[in-house]
């Protein structure tokens, strides 16, 4: 009985940790928004990022079945746009298709075999349209769309 109680308490304490992946599939980079160079757009548009049952591979992040962990935080659109770490989204909100009132911010971490091999892809942002994701990196926002043709 103690084990069941501990399990239930753990589920409430750590609700945002997930080993499953609703991002499963192939995501294609369709745009680059922000302070980017032309070559950055040229290098990334059309490239893909894939997630599949513990595997991640692509233009931004690779984790070869070695501890891919997903965590998420939820915000209202106002909370999200007012957070300092997401100020670039606020600056470019007219260029981005930010529909809805709820925002999901996801962190993908690959623990690897050693601490030195730990990698992270953060933040991956969705605005109620789960077919589109935004990845903020190095002062630019990469727009990714789910490639349903790969299913």
Question: Model regions: which residues?
Answer:
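Sec-dependent N-terminal signal peptides
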Residues: 4-15
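Residue-level detector of intrinsically disordered/flexible regions characterized by low predicted structural confidence
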Residues: 4-5, 43, 104, 121
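Sec/Tat signal peptide C-region and signal peptidase I cleavage site
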Residues: 16-20
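Short, solvent-exposed loop/hinge segments that bridge or flank secondary-structure elements
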Residues: 23-24, 29-64, 105, 109-110, ...
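A mature extracytoplasmic/lumenal domain signature
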Residues: 31, 67-69, 148
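N-terminal glycine/threonine-rich, aromatic-flanked beta-hairpin/loop signature
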Residues: 38-88, 137-141
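Beta-sheet ligand-binding and adhesion/scaffold domains
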Residues: 80-151
């Amino acid at each position: 009985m103690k084990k069941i109680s501990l399990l239930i308490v753990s589920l409430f304490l750590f609700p945002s940790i997930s080993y499953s992946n609703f991002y499963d599939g192939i995501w294609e980079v369709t745009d680059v928004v922000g302070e980017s160079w032309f070559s950055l757009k040229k290098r990334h548009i059309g490239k893909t990022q894939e997630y599949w049952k513990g595997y991640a591979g692509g233009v931004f992040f690779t984790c070869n079945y070695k501890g891919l962990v997903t965590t998420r935080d939820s915000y209202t659109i106002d909370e999200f746009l007012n957070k300092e770490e997401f100020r670039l989204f606020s600056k470019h909100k007219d260029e981005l298709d930010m529909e809805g009132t709820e925002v999901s911010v996801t962190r993908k971490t690959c623990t690897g075999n050693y601490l030195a091999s730990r990698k992270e892809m953060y933040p991956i942002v969705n605005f109620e349209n789960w077919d589109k994701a935004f990845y903020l990196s190095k002062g630019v926002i990469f727009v990714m769309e789910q490639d349903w043709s790969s299913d």
